[in-house]
Amino acid sequence: PDVYLLHGDLSDDEMNQMYNHPKVKAHLSFTHGEGFGRPLLEASFSGKPILAPIATGQKDFLDYDYTVGLPYNMHQVPQSAFPKGYANENAIWPTVDYGQASALMNDVFKNYKKYQLRGKKQMIVNRENFTHEKMKKKLESIVDKMLSGVSKEVSLKLPKLKKKQDTKLPKLKKA
């Protein structure tokens, strides 16, 4: 099969056209340091098969049953991959097994209808779970949980003062 590599900045409209172009039959990513991976979530909305390592942030929205999970091994992140001042010597990320990924790509090409159904199911799950309203509620839940106990309303209990009737103020001298 033909494989096209894209590199550079694309507008939202261009990305949408690419995701939904009839010649694009599947979405492939060997990502390893993406975090949440918004492009893969967006690609899932096209209903086409997704081939990617289901590791790190992608686990939040790529279902093992509906995605072609690419085999990977976890490796230490090279220090050169971090912005200055952000290095973390304990950080690890997945590196795809290229040989097995190649075999899976060929299988998707040869058995496209089987994988196409999985892509459609992933689309349905993500369109249900990743609406703007559901993300808003999820964020509110996280913020509420983080802020619970940070500040609490407390009642103010002041002592009761007895009023003295015959209190005289001292006379002040003019300066």
Predicted regions located by residue number:
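Nucleotide-activated donor-binding/catalytic signature segment of Leloir-type glycosyltransferases, i.e.
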Residues: 1-18, 25
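Aromatic "clamp/platform" in nucleotide-sugar-dependent glycosyltransferases that forms part
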Residues: 32
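Short hydrophobic faces within alpha-helices
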Residues: 42-43, 51
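Short glycine/serine-rich donor-binding loops of glycosyltransferases
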Residues: 37-40, 55
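Short hydrophobic beta-strand element within catalytic cores of glycosyltransferases
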Residues: 49-52, 68-71
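C-terminal amphipathic helix plus adjacent low-complexity
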Residues: 83-175
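A short alpha->beta transition loop at the rim of the catalytic pocket in nucleotide-sugar-dependent
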Residues: 23-25, 47, 54
